Amino acid sequence: MQGLKSAISFFTIIPVKADLNKNIVFFFTITGAITGLMAASIFYLTSFINQLLASVASVSFLIIIYGFNHADAVLDLGDTFMVHDPEKKKIIIKDVYHGTGSVVTFFIIYIITISLLSSFNSIQGSIALILSETISRFSMLMSMYKSNSFSGGISEIFISYFDKPFKITFFNFLVIILIFLIFYKYIIFTMFSLISIVISYYFKSHEQKIFNGINGDIIGFTGELSRLISLLLILISFKLI
């Protein structure tokens, strides 16, 4: 259980004391399921007041519970979309200041996420939050597969922990399967969200080619992008099927 405590302590502001443990990579999706369940509870309870309020409250909660780290990743990577030169991108992504690109990217990611959530009813939105958050963490984990770090630091540590890819991937994917089984009545609608894993991995691969590696910001952005795409795919399936 040290790996789970380490994951909760590292990724969230939940007051759990634990050192960074190598087994943390086995608990990415469980951490996502926990935070997703918390966000879903907020969404469900506030949706009876107003759907938009519920969406804003739950997304705000997710930004805060992760200590603003993933939101910061969106801001950091956002500015790099404004330039094409790889070396300039590396300088910009490490810059503590944020420009137009970061602000626009931030609003695109989170306004679309809020808009998508506001289109669900209380039950659908709650399920979508749990699943999309779990898949988001799985996408972050998979972003480390066949990757190297260009900046050192925490990304290099996590990539070194990903030394048993099949075992780690299988264990994390079991959590997603469990969620599908719990919400089996909605499996036809929710299974399309798995496509977001492929799309977000393609995004990571694209960024890795540009930067000649990845860092914590790319990993964090991949998770936020995966959540958005998951919600979009779930919403489309609910509307069309």
Swiss-Prot record:
Any one cellular-component term (Gene Ontology): plasma membrane
Q: Where in the cell is it found?
A: Cell membrane
- Give a single Pfam family match: CobS
Catalytic activity, EC: 2.7.8.26
| Protein topology in the membrane | Multi-pass membrane protein
Predominantly, its location class is membrane
The regions listed as transmembrane in this protein's record are 24-44, 48-68, 103-123, 175-195, 218-238
Q: Which InterPro entries match?
A: CobS (IPR003805)
Which pathway is it part of?
A: Cofactor biosynthesis; adenosylcobalamin biosynthesis; adenosylcobalamin from cob(II)yrinate a,c-diamide: step 7/7
> A single GO molecular function, which one?
cobalamin 5'-phosphate synthase activity
Task: Print the keywords alphabetically.
Answer: Cell membrane, Cobalamin biosynthesis, Magnesium, Membrane, Transferase, Transmembrane, Transmembrane helix
Q: Which reaction does it catalyse?
A: alpha-ribazole + adenosylcob(III)inamide-GDP = adenosylcob(III)alamin + GMP + H(+); alpha-ribazole 5'-phosphate + adenosylcob(III)inamide-GDP = adenosylcob(III)alamin 5'-phosphate + GMP + H(+)
* Family the UniProt entry places it in: Belongs to the CobS family.
Q: What does this protein do?
A: Joins adenosylcobinamide-GDP and alpha-ribazole to generate adenosylcobalamin (Ado-cobalamin). Also synthesizes adenosylcobalamin 5'-phosphate from adenosylcobinamide-GDP and alpha-ribazole 5'-phosphate.
Q: What is this protein called?
A: Adenosylcobinamide-GDP ribazoletransferase
Organism, per UniProt? Picrophilus torridus (strain ATCC 700027 / DSM 9790 / JCM 10055 / NBRC 100828 / KAW 2/3)
Q: Its encoding gene is what?
A: cobS
